[in-house]
């Protein structure tokens, strides 16, 4: 199928490696969270929402693993223990929901005070505008929390892109390489899966989406992981969003 022939009702975009550079996430966002997590927890330790996150983090199997690594783990859970655990999870690149939620709150402070601006590739705003003008919905599915997703697009280098976006999904709907997650998204969007185009940089995610009936395209942005030959042969590949700007809604057979 050529880009000019492709139709969809919804474009579902990944963030890291798709709309936003991997380097921004790993060289800006993650270090910012690591540097600021302890101060953030000290300032908000007694807040009910933060305590709920702390409780959820203690239920993670990695929490006991982390305490084993400590020479002298504290008798009680305190700021230093949880801050260290968060830094450990970030270093291990473990995408667990309570940690992602906490990261989102830390980043919110950074975006609000102007220390952070969300990176998007230069072709993203024009594609968003074209898709919305054509009547398509744009939704986001990322391992980062919904709050963090809104911050990247709401405080981007080119301004607020949130008006283009109609739905956000994170790991609460399931893991990104699980077919069921994409079925859940289609159900929540109330759309036929084949009318949803998923854009990602990860073959495993594209395969899961395709198994659920979605269309899937893999983005080969600068800095993205190289693909094996069999992966290149199995999926449609694109360098950016430019060739997708002509996406159209399917023609209603009663209007044709």
From Swiss-Prot:
Cofactor(s) essential for the protein: Mg(2+)
GO biological process: L-methionine salvage from methylthioadenosine
Primary localization: cytoplasm
A Pfam family this chain is assigned to: Hydrolase
CDD domains (alphabetical): HAD_EP (cd01629)
The keyword Metal-binding is assigned to this record: yes
Compartments (UniProt record): Cytoplasm; Nucleus
Keyword Ribosomal protein attached: no
EC number: 3.1.3.77
GO molecular function, one term: magnesium ion binding
One GO cellular component, as annotated: cytoplasm
Substrates-to-products reaction catalysed: 5-methylsulfanyl-2,3-dioxopentyl phosphate + H2O = 1,2-dihydroxy-5-(methylsulfanyl)pent-1-en-3-one + phosphate
InterPro entries: Enolase-ppase_E1 (IPR023943), ENOPH1_eukaryotes (IPR027511), HAD-like_sf (IPR036412), HAD-SF_hydro_IA (IPR006439), HAD_sf (IPR023214)
Annotated Mg(2+) binding sites: 14, 16, 201
Assembly information from the UniProt record: Monomer.
Membership in a protein family: Belongs to the HAD-like hydrolase superfamily. MasA/MtnC family.
Stated name of the protein: Enolase-phosphatase E1
UniProt source species: Drosophila yakuba (Fruit fly)
Lineage per the UniProt record: Eukaryota, Metazoa, Ecdysozoa, Arthropoda, Hexapoda
